[in-house]
Amino acid sequence: MTVDTITSTSNGNQDVPKEFLPIEFETQLLHLGRFPDILGSCAVPVYSSAAFEFNSVAHGARLLNLTQFGNIYSRFTNPTVNVLQNRLAGLEGGVAACGVASGSAAVVVTVMALTGVGDNFVSSFHVHAGTFHQFDSLAKQMGIECRFVKSRDPADFAAAIDDKTKFVWLETISNPGNVILDLEAVSTVCHTKGIPLICDNTFGCAGYFCRPIDHGVDIVVHSATKWIGGHGTTVGGIIVDGGTFDWGQHPDRFPQFHDPRTRLWERFSRRAFAVRCQFEILRDTGSTLSAPAAQQLLVGLESLAVRCERHAQNAAKIADWLREYPLVAWVSYVGHPNHPDHQGALKYLKRGFGSVICFGLRGGFEAGALFCDALKMVITTTNLGDAKTLILHPASTTHEHFSSEHRAEAGVTDDMIRLSVGIEQIKDIKADFEQAFKQVLRGKKSLRKPCIGKILMQDEINEDLFGPSACRT
C-alpha cells in the first residue's frame, strides 16, 4: 500500500522492516518495493488468488477496519499489485499508490475520490482525447462539471476556480499537442485556493523524465500501459499520492476525508487520498488491476531507464532529420529551441525530452493518411510508449469525432502525424519513413499495409480457425 509502511510479505500477513532502499532511480526500477518471498522466488510472484485467508476473526476485523494493512480480496488488495504500487510511489516521490485496471480507470477513480454531484473541477483543454471525453461527457452524467482552460496562463486557471472546485488537472506534456504548462505556477494557484493539483505524468515515464511532485503537484496518474509496461502487452493505470496536500485544512471542501465513520485524514494523514482511492472507490467500483497484469508492468519497469534513454536519443535525431526533409511542413518536438514550450521542457524534464514528436506533411489530411498507410515496419495504432515505433493520424482516428474548431483549438491539424519513437536502430526507422515519403510523393495508395514477414488477412485467419468453408459466402 505504501512506501513508508509495508505490512505484507508473500502471504500478505506479516510486517517487514524497511532494511534497504536503493538510492539511484535505475536501481529502484528493479528493487524498490520487493520483499523476500517465502519460497525464494527472485521475480515478483503472481498471486492469482481472489481472496486471502485471515489468521483469525480478529485479524480479519483489523484488516477490514484498516487498523492493519494486508491482503483481503484481490478486487482492491493483492500482493503482486502491492509491489507495483510501492515501486511506482517511490519512483514518483509519493507516499502511496493505487493500481487500477487502466489509465482511464485512474482518471475516473481520481475524480470520484474528490468530487460529488454539484461539484466542479478545472482541467487544461490540452489533454488526451479520451480524458477530454471523460471530463466533458462522463463527468457531466455524474452531475460534475469540468471547466476547461484553453490558455497557458495560470491566472486563467485561477479565474475558473470557485468554492465548489475540487482540483485542477493537467498533463506533463499534453497528448498530442505537446503543450507544457508551468507546473509550479499552477500549483501556487491551486494551493492558494485550497485545492490540489493533479498531473497525468504518462509522458514523464514514471519519473524518468519528470517527477511532478517535486514541482508542487499533489497527485500523479499514469496510463501504465504506455512506457511503464513498455511493450504493448498489458493495460493498467496507477494513481500516486504525493502526500503533500493538507486535507485537514479544508474539511468543508473535502468532507469525505473527515467522515466520522472512517476518519481518513485523522487516521492516515498524508496517505488519506491513496487510502480512499484503494479501500473505498476501487473497492466499490471494481476497476481492478489483475495480478498477472501487475507483474507484466513490473517486468516492463525493470528496463524503463534503458528504454527511455534510447527513446529520447532516437526521438531527438528523428526530429532533427524530419525538420530537414522537404516533404515535412512542420515539426513539434519539445526538445527543440523553437518549440513554444521549450523553456518549460528545460525546467521540468531531465534525462531528455521524451519520445513523442508531432509533424505535418505538405499535402494535408490526405498526405498524412497516405503516409501512415505506406509504412512497412512502423505500426499505425492509437497506443504510445511501446518499444516499437508507433504512429497515428489523429484527425482521422482519435479526434475524428471532434469538430474542426475543437481540433484547431487543441492543435490537432488535419496534417498532424503523432509519432511515438521506439528503440529500433534509427537507420531502419528512417528507411521506412523514406520509402513511405516516396509513396506519398507518387500519390500511391496502399490498399493493404505491408509488414516484415507474412501477415494473415482476415479471411486467412478465419480459414485457419474455422476451415475453408467458414469464410466463404
From Swiss-Prot:
What is the annotated role of this protein in its UniProt record?
Sulfhydrylase-like protein; part of the gene cluster that mediates the biosynthesis of loline alkaloids, potent insecticidal agents composed of a pyrrolizidine ring system and an uncommon ether bridge linking carbons 2 and 7. Lolines are structurally differentiated by the various modifications of the L-amino group and include norloline, loline, N-methylloline, N-acetylloline, N-acetylnorloline, and N-formylloline.
Query: What biotechnological or industrial uses does this protein have?
Result: Loline alkaloids show broad-spectrum anti-insect activity, and different lolines may have different biological activities. In vitro tests of NFL, NAL, NML, and semisynthetic loline derivatives with long carbon-chain acylations on the 1-amine have shown that many are effective against both fall armyworm larvae and European corn borer larvae, but the effects seem to differ depending on the modifications. N-Formylloline reduces the weight gain of fall armyworms by deterring feeding, and does not significantly affect corn borers.
Q: Which cysteines are joined by disulfide bonds?
A: none
Q: How does inactivating the gene affect the organism?
A: Significantly decreases loline-alkaloid production.
> Known Gene3D superfamilies for this protein?
Aspartate Aminotransferase, domain 1, Type I PLP-dependent aspartate aminotransferase-like (Major domain)
| PTM annotation (N6-(pyridoxal phosphate)lysine): residues | K226
Q: Which CDD domains match?
A: CGS_like (cd00614)
Q: Which organism is it from?
A: Epichloe uncinata
Keyword vocabulary terms for this entry:
Alkaloid metabolism, Pyridoxal phosphate, Transferase
Query: GO molecular function terms here?
Result: cysteine synthase activity; O-acetylhomoserine aminocarboxypropyltransferase activity; pyridoxal phosphate binding
Q: Might you give the EC number(s) for this enzyme?
A: 2.5.1.-
Q: In which pathway does it act?
A: Alkaloid biosynthesis
Q: Which Pfam families match?
A: Cys_Met_Meta_PP
Q: Name one GO cellular component term.
A: cytoplasm
Please tell me whether the keyword Transferase is annotated for this protein: yes
Q: What is this protein called?
A: Sulfhydrylase-like protein lolC2
**InterPro entries, from UniProt?**
Cys/Met-Metab_PyrdxlP-dep_enz, Cys_met_metab_PP, OAc-hSer/O-AcSer_sulfhydrylase, PyrdxlP-dep_Trfase, PyrdxlP-dep_Trfase_major, PyrdxlP-dep_Trfase_small
Q: What cofactor is needed?
A: pyridoxal 5'-phosphate
The UniProt entry's GO biological process terms, in alphabetical order, are:
alkaloid metabolic process; cysteine biosynthetic process from serine; L-homocysteine biosynthetic process; transsulfuration
Which family does the UniProt entry place this protein in?
Belongs to the trans-sulfuration enzymes family.
What is expression of this protein induced or repressed by?
A: Expression is induced in loline alkaloid-producing cultures as well as in planta.
